[in-house]
């Protein structure tokens, strides 16, 4: 199949370099659907790690070009598709960081990421499901920045599935925050699980906040500040401090402590809350994680278990209530 320069040659000269790259990427992403036998080449297991190394060295564009040339001849390498999808996801995030300017825009990068990640899922790459879900959460972020939290929440459509134990984590985190509360998430895994959990459990009236985005993304900060009823010019810690007298703040196990206002925090289920919480009617469940721990070799099972481990470091009651999960390998906080 054609290399990247030949794909790029179909773009008119007046088109910007960003759009030129977008056309090239779009042409590449059509390759798996062409089903041309001539496009099939041997899978090279070294290409995906080489691309990852380039990205770590700050050469993401070179990594994408490498993957593009390679996947044009070896479209059945699922790990290479995963890397390509991740890199387009990172490009979308950079678009936010750079003031929501430039071409392609963030949504187009997310479209590219979704297409590449769906190829990795087709080829049974475990992490494809996780990163495909993150793409949907990032699309939700663009929706929040465009129309606000309430409208974005109401307008969400059914998203591609994620592993049940990840969804279960999100539901447990949301159920750990009292109704009307503000849930501060930390890791991408937590943010993903909570985003999906809020779709499955819309009756849980909890507002998720990503403090890292609040600190760095002006559009996100403006929309979420208005939702919380605070001044958008305030830094995240002061903004949350203004919210605390009116709404319970809930800090997830991986939430950045630097973003938390100086309040008396107390453990409640999987989170720490800014004021005493009324016992919730819904019980937590870890059945999906227990099932995955027995049946799956995915590293994401361990990552999800790690969130529960970190929660136990703040709430020793979890050492007994999650005894079935911890089993013979309890987290350090639960060891004698």
Question: Residue spans of the language-model regions?
Answer:
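Bacterial N-terminal signal peptides
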Residues: 24-34
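Signal peptide processing junction and immediate N-terminal pro/mature segment
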Residues: 35-39
């Amino acid at each position: 199949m054609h290399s990247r320069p030949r794909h790029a040659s179909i773009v008119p000269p007046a088109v910007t370099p960003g759009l030129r790259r977008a056309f090239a990427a779009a042409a590449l992403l059509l390759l798996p659907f062409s089903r041309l036998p001539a496009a099939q080449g041997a899978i090279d297991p070294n290409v995906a790690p080489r691309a990852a190394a380039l990205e770590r060295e700050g050469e993401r564009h070179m990594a994408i070009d490498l993957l593009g040339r390679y996947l044009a001849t070896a479209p059945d390498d699922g790990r290479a598709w995963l890397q390509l999808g991740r890199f387009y996801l990172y490009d979308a995030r950079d678009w936010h960081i750079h003031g929501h300017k430039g071409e392609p825009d963030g949504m187009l990068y997310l479209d590219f990421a979704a297409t590449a990640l769906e190829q990795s899922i087709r080829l049974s790459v475990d992490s494809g499901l996780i990163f495909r879900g993150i793409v949907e959460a990032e699309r939700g972020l663009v929706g929040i920045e465009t129309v606000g939290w309430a409208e974005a929440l109401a307008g969400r459509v059914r998203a591609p599935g994620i592993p049940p134990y990840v969804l279960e984590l999100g539901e447990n985190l949301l159920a750990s925050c009292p109704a009307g509360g503000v849930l501060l998430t930390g890791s991408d895994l937590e943010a993903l699980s909570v985003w999906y959990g809020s779709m499955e459990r819309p009756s849980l009236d909890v507002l998720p906040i990503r403090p890292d985005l609040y600190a760095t993304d002006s559009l996100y900060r403006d929309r979420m500040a208005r939702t919380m009823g605070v001044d958008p010019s305030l830094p995240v810690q002061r903004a949350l401090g203004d919210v605390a007298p009116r709404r319970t703040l809930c800090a997830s196990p991986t939430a950045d402590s630097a973003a938390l206002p100086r309040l008396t925090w107390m453990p409640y289920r999987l989170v720490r809350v800014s004021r005493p919480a009324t016992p919730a009617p819904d019980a937590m469940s870890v059945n999906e994680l227990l099932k995955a721990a027995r049946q799956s070799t995915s590293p994401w099972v361990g990552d999800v278990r790690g969130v529960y481990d970190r929660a136990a470091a703040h709430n020793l009651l979890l050492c007994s209530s999650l005894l079935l999960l911890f089993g013979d390998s309890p987290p350090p906080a639960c060891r004698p």
